[in-house]
């Protein structure tokens, strides 16, 4: 049985759920790495792109105090203890395909979408705050997912996946499969969950919505139909959940690579009004960000120029950063209501970039350091 300690405790400590802080500064100042630090993490399973191939590294760091860390899966059939000291990077690898899972712990096997599972989600408890990343290791489709801690727990989320893509590949293409997916883990019994796609998009069940009930520790993965993206999809629940979403091996519109862009998503309550997007190395239009409005009458500007006026709740769009690649050039995104901003970019300066995706934190100051 999964340990309930932090699952119950965080509900009685609302201050923990307001610790997003000024986490954008991690892009600039290593001393501010505490922005993603926490003592509890719930990590929904990462959907595989090739059967049995999701080798996952979990990496831990601590900024100030030595931390005793416990990693376990939903039923504690996987359990490991680590000690993380300040200044050290501690890595544990999940490499073995587990009987009954057909994948490593922390991953979801290709054939088990739209089904409840009880062993593939991961949980982390720490005696002192730590920073956690999941690293998908393979010669292709590598990715890094930042654990959001208690800031990643809530009941109302919007998610995204790359939008400027050539196609979603459901058949075998050089031994991989491309999918837009959303992955969820419940923290309490009898949690009712609804995933609702934006108008015009459907899931692989042929419907624009998926509804199910999960017990504590159970997880669920839903995928979109061919060429339908996640941008603007809403996830709501009756009790707190954690959500990871994005795309596996999606072919970008200017080349052949099939790339992964996945992130753990923060709930609506942790969003803000101001974001900074830093230009990557991709050529136009492949360096872009996506936005989602969470309230009616939302206005959004980029460097003072309007990109959305009086947008309705759930309105979403894609904005390509103009001009030639200028790595590091900042673009200021401001809104009058809280919004999501997801960036898609690359470190490759050519027309066939390897594109990742991540949710950008807002830079509004909340008065906290975590």
Task: Please state what every model-predicted region is.
Residues 1-38:
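Bacterial Sec-dependent N-terminal signal peptides
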Residues 36-370:
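Intrinsically disordered, low-complexity linker/terminal regions across diverse proteins
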